[in-house]
UniProtKB/Swiss-Prot annotation:
SMART domains: Arfaptin, PDZ. Residues 373-416 are annotated as: Disordered. One of its GO terms (molecular function) is protein domain specific binding. CDD domains: BAR_PICK1 (cd07659), PDZ_PICK1-like (cd06722). This is PRKCA-binding protein.
């Protein structure tokens, strides 16, 4: 097709400049340099690198990248050749091979089109859908298989809930212990006052000793609060700083992941479009003019994949460190909590054992309860009122008899 035109078709570079160069690569044990080639006769006037594979001579050298045009192999021009012929030329060379290329000076922002943005949005929506739901809605699930970071994110959320519950429980427990210590202090103050006012020395000493025991328990409670309170600070640091920072990193990773998947999907669509036009033997305009749009997307995909791989590595390292900190920190915090509580109860038990002062003998005042012949019987107020009423009635009857005079034996009144 291009032989008839002698390759004088003007390339549509989309304003993307190219810089010529050459690189010498040492082949690996499989006699490969680690690149895949696209384009070439008979539909495209140039050959270009589609992908640079990881951990290969081309990838380790880093000179050539996806989208770069290949112009020659070991000083021989490849103009008008197919990609299969160029691949054979590279394979025939043993040891070192020199690749002549035109470096594509592409700006990744040029590849971030509206189509890529919409694909990222679709991937975000489909990410949390099940396969059945996505198929019912006619959406393809272009996701990475065995992406363990999604499960790690769920584990992180469960860990955050665990720490949140521990923090709330510890706050309530410390508040209860503070109120309990204040109650012990009030007990100590009350028994101290009783001991000071008690006239009997033995009883006074017993009350004071019991009061000191409660005051000591109050001090033990304050010491417990001071020991466990830093536990809240550590838990809050993990909950409010470490976990949100890791969650933000995972969100950035997901954004890079969706961008990479969007470019992969775009490349797949452009490949399908190109293959569909091969059958009728008519080339696409972008293919016949150098396929620069496709090469730009290839470069963007490669750079997005590099960012994705680096971000994934960083997230895995951060998650690993966070898991180690979680295991070590939770063990340390629980050990500190248990040891502090154990010391508190042991100290309280020892203090109360020393303050075993009951029963206490107390002499009550003589005015309260008195026994003896000189003391009258105890009467309450109701009996005194009844006696007063009976005395008043007898006095009234005597007065009546004195006013009317005496009576005779028959019971009749007689005048004096």
């Amino acid at each position: 097709m291009f032989a008839d035109l002698d390759y004088d078709i003007e390339e549509d570079k989309l304003g993307i400049p190219t810089v010529p160069g050459k690189v010498t690569l040492q082949k690996d044990a499989q006699n490969l340099i680690g690149i895949s080639i696209g384009g070439g006769a008979q539909y495209c006037p140039c050959l270009y690198i589609v992908q640079v594979f990881d951990n290969t001579p081309a990838a380790l050298d880093g000179t050539v990248a996806a989208g770069d045009e290949i112009t020659g192999v070991n000083g021989k021009s490849i103009k008008g050749k197919t990609k299969v012929e160029v691949a054979k030329m590279i394979q025939e060379v043993k040891g070192e091979v020199t690749i002549h290329y035109n470096k594509l000076q592409a700006d990744p922002k040029q590849g971030m089109s509206l189509d890529i943005v919409l694909k990222k949005v679709k991937h975000r929506l489909v990410e949390n859908m099940s396969s059945g739901t996505a198929d019912a809605l006619g959406l393809s699930r272009a996701i990475l298989c065995n992406d363990g970071l999604v499960k790690r994110l769920e584990e992180l959320e469960r860990t955050a809930e665990l720490y949140k519950g521990m923090t709330e429980h510890t706050k309530n427990l410390l508040r209860a212990f503070y109120e309990l210590s204040q109650t012990h202090r009030a007990f100590g103050d009350v028994f101290s006052v009783i001991g000071v006012r008690e006239p009997q020395p033995a009883a006074s000493e017993a009350f004071v000793k019991f009061a000191d025991a409660h005051r000591s328990i109050e001090k033990f409670g304050i010491r417990l609060l001071k020991t466990i309170k830093p536990m809240l600070t550590d838990l809050n640091t993990y909950l409010n700083k470490a976990i949100p920072d890791t969650r933000l990193t995972i969100k950035k990773y997901l954004d890079v992941k969706f961008e990479y998947l969007s470019y992969c999907l775009k490349v797949k669509e452009m490949d399908d479009e190109e293959y569909s036009c091969i059958g009728p033997r008519r080339a696409l305009y972008r293919v016949s003019t150098g396929n620069y749009e496709y090469r730009l997307i290839l470069r963007c995909r490669q750079e997005a994949r590099a960012r994705f791989s680096q971000m994934r590595k960083d997230v895995l390292e951060k998650m690993e460190l966070l898991d180690q900190k979680h295991v070590q920190d939770i063990v340390f915090q629980l050990q500190r909590f248990v040891s502090t509580m154990s010391k508190y109860y042991n100290d309280c038990y020892a203090v109360l054992q020393d303050a075993d002062v009951f029963p206490i003998e107390v002499d009550l005042a003589h005015t309260t309860l008195a026994y003896g012949p000189n003391q009258g019987s105890f009467t309450d107020g109701e009996e005194e009122d009844e006696e007063e009423e009976d005395g008043a009635a007898r006095e009234v009857s005597k007065d009546a008899c004195g006013a009317t005079g005496p009576t005779d034996k028959g019971g009749s009144w007689c005048d004096s």
